[in-house]
């Protein structure tokens, strides 16, 4: 089957688009994105879609950027594909946000794509991820430690994002580029082994192909099966949470402790997100929450984003962690006998002689205290 027919069948099977949709292609000028844009432009009449393109200049390779921009503009002009071009400062963004270059470049690129899609009325954004990208992602997740979600690799679709080339091999894409005389630019950073992904691509994958020439296809298929299993288990976890939830972010700890691990460990991140947490939880954090289901009423553990998980009698509760008053800062001040001072979230009063503490008070007896008495934050 030709790449064109394979992509058409794949898009139809996964219902990536609907007739009348406008699709924005992420066009970098590299081979994958050029093949993607060419394919979608050719398939547009059969899919009933309109195709537009967007080209983002990251500012990381100023010597290559003009050539890539010219290629994208010429390619789109010849085919009457509307194109939006924008330039960003990735290094400045990374400095400001405190993130790595790859992470910063990706954040800027996707923010640009989504902004353009909104402005142009494009319901879908197509990216050029292919089978090798998916295999690299699965292997990368395995090396770092992952569950079934990570084994699923790159999703076929993700909200407004679609990946029509995800089952296409790199060889099939290169053949398509050659047969259709499609020009493209090569990114020299793809050859630099300073990046972990490139080491996987240039060192690990050739060894796997030597074991089985279809290794990439088999790994990708295994990822698809893992993704389907994950979707089913996620639905089981969501139903369990619905049945045993006591409040947003709270669940019956005893019921959760008796649940199958495969369900319980998917409920835990759901509780975390209900409490305002973002992203995923590491295995360490899940194990910490799981241990709370087995412990007494006073146990707690800290989670990312200022969230706390706590065992409250028969409940496992996730909530925003309260600020510790001892960590607050304030200006030092002098205490005078009988005059209350409110600082750092406390009311402090200096007395002579004995003083019994009320239900919301603490009394401390300091022998040989010398005046003046100063109240200050902890050092």
What label would you give each PLM region?
Residues 61-62, 102-103, 163, 194, ...:
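A generic secondary-structure micro-motif detector
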Residues 3-32, 52, 56, 90, ...:
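AMP-forming adenylation/ATP pyrophosphatase catalytic core
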């Amino acid at each position: 089957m030709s790449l064109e027919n394979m992509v058409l069948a794949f898009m139809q099977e996964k219902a990536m688009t609907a007739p009348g949709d406008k699709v924005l292609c992420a066009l970098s000028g590299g081979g994958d994105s050029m093949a993607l844009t060419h394919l979608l432009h050719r398939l547009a009449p059969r899919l009933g879609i309109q195709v537009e393109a967007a080209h983002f200049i990251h500012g990381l390779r100023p010597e290559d950027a003009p050539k890539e921009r010219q290629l994208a503009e010429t390619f789109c002009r010849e085919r009457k594909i509307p194109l939006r071009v924008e330039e960003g400062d990735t290094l400045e963004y990374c400095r400001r946000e405190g993130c790595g270059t790859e992470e910063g470049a990706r954040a800027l690129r996707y923010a640009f794509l989504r902004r353009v899609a909104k402005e142009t009325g494009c319901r879908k954004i197509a990216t050029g991820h292919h089978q090798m990208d998916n295999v690299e992602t699965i292997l990368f997740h395995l090396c770092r430690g992952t569950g079934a979600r990570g084994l699923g690799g790159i999703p076929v679709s993700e909200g407004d994002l679609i990946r029509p080339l995800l089952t296409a091999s790199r060889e099939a894409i290169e053949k398509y580029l050659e047969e259709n005389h499609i020009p493209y630019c090569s990114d020299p950073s793809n050859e630099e082994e300073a990046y972990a992904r490139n080491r996987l691509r240039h060192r690990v994958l050739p060894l796997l192909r030597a074991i089985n020439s279809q290794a990439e296809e088999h790994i990708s298929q295994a990822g698809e099966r893992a993704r389907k299993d994950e979707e089913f288990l996620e639905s089981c976890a969501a139903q369990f949470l619905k049945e045993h939830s006591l409040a947003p972010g709270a669940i019956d700890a005893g019921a959760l402790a008796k649940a199958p691990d495969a369900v319980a460990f998917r409920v835990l991140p759901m509780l975390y997100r209900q409490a305002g947490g973002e992203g995923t939880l590491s295995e360490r954090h899940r194990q910490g929450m799981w241990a709370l289901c087995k412990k007494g009423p006073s146990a707690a553990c800290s989670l990312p984003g200022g969230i706390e998980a706590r065992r409250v009698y028969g409940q496992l509760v996730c909530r925003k962690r309260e600020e510790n008053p001892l960590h607050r800062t304030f200006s030092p001040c002098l205490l005078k006998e009988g005059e209350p001072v409110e600082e750092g979230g406390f009311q402090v009063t200096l007395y002579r002689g004995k003083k019994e503490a009320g239900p919301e008070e603490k009394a401390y007896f300091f022998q040989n205290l010398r005046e003046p008495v100063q109240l200050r934050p902890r050092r």
